Curated annotation (Swiss-Prot):
This protein's name: Putative glutaminase 3
Reactions the enzyme catalyzes: L-glutamine + H2O = L-glutamate + NH4(+)
Keywords, sorted A to Z: ANK repeat, Hydrolase, Repeat
Leading EC class: hydrolase
Amino acid sequence: MDNKEKEDEELSDELKDQPGPSEKPRTPTVVAFTKPSFYRVNTVISDVKVCRSMSYDMCGNHQQELLFDLYKDETTGKVYLPRFFKALLESGIRKDDPRIDKMIQNIKDADLLDDFVWGTQHIYLEKDTFKRYIGSSIGVVTKALKKQMIIPDWERFVSDMGEIFEDVRSHNEGDLATYIPQLSRVAPDSWAMSVCTIDGQRKMWGDALKPFCLQSVSKPFTYALVHDDIGPEELHAHVGQEPSGRLFNDISLDHNKKPHNPLINAGAIVVASLLKNKLPLADRFDFMIHACRKFVGSGYIGFDNSVFLSERETADRNYALSYYMREHKVFPKDLNLQDTLDLYFQICSIETNCDSLAVMAATLANGGVNPMNGERIVNNRACRDTLSLMYSCGMYDWSGQFAFHVGLPAKSGVSGDMIIVIPNVMGIALYSPRLDKLGNTVRGVKFAEQLVQKYNFHNYDSLIYSDNKKIDPRRQLKDDHDGQNRFMYATKLGDIAAIKRFLLMGHDIHCKDYDDRTVLHVAAAEGDVVTLEYVLSKWQEDPNPCDRYDRTPLDDAKHFNHTACVKLLEEAITVYNLKGQDD
């Protein structure tokens, strides 16, 4: 077995296990270039010149052709699928992403793959087949490979998040919830986390597929659904919006004789009483289960009947709350109190896992639209009001401290689950059943605190004139000159993956800097044979251009005694000159 076959086999095995970010990228394969048949125009938007391709208007397949040219194998002239999918994985697009389901199914239907697209077979696709198979997913594929997702440097981000996750694992303080017998029997040291961005980038750590009950984390979603259904005026005629300053199950009402907010037990019971309350109890529960399944998309939603029965048998406090509120006429008229409480207990007993819960949180971060399938679940106003309540009331009696130190909407539950929503960026789900004295997951709170120490996610970290040194991992809008500089720098580093990305984004490989130097000058001066060979394979003009000092790439290669680069450039110049004579 030669070295290339061995590398391909190792790559297939690595992808099959769906790893985290690799420590060092492999040397990319040098490929031949076929110039795509499209042209570009310049568009001015708000005084910023932006390049955009007109080929989409003329010919809908130019992106497929460009992707093929950028990722095809040097030897076979075909795309090696595991390597192509690895590039997607490194951008945050997982193999179970529903947006690439059709693409993967097309390949499976052709009997080219086994059950896992990241299988052990060496799969190569020719151009027409490749274009046909990826056409249904070209939007998300192109966006991912262009690094235009909300978190462009996904590998670095998941590496940092993994470090925080492992650091927080050492916190073993806290106790299990005991007032619900079933919750007191779970494994106390379980620790899980999952992230889902508004662009559908996903990653999970630890016991992220282990099921647990939503408990109080269901409350924001129930509130959002009722808000979307009946509107904020009718909803808040029965429940307030203020932090209570009391325990989550305290028997008390605000000065208007309403529960303080929808995220404590009293408020959540009232919200449950408003959920499709014209329907029979069974239909109301069906509505809630189906709504949760819409929130998770293709993720897991179940129901733990034992927790439901256990909670109903030990719910004296919630019964007392409900009778107290009925005395003060908080509920809508003609209410069946037992049905309302049963529905509330059922909603708390809905089961999911960290990986699916992250998608639910990301749906809130995305304005009520599921990022995995684009389906709107709740309207934007309902989502906005939900996040406002989570920010001020989501962490029981620690809500004020959490808003001050972390500055993000969040909600915790006594099962040990917790969600953090970073609006317009991502949702984070955490699970660790050890709770502090206020009922919040200890590790979840510690994670949130460390998260905002590293990243500028706090609601007020982005104030102007800020002097903090926190990282902003979000995609930044760059002008053309900045992109050109980064293109040159990628060439200096020999980062062929980045060079491919810049070409896919429409950057001109022949562009020059302020000294009229090109990427050929940079690669030749660095003596990077692999990068120089790749750049030459894309070069369509004279491969020996002069800079402002009349120095050519060949001059630089000779000056620094890079003999292999000299040979490459001389061969390219000869081929170019011969082609000119033929023309």
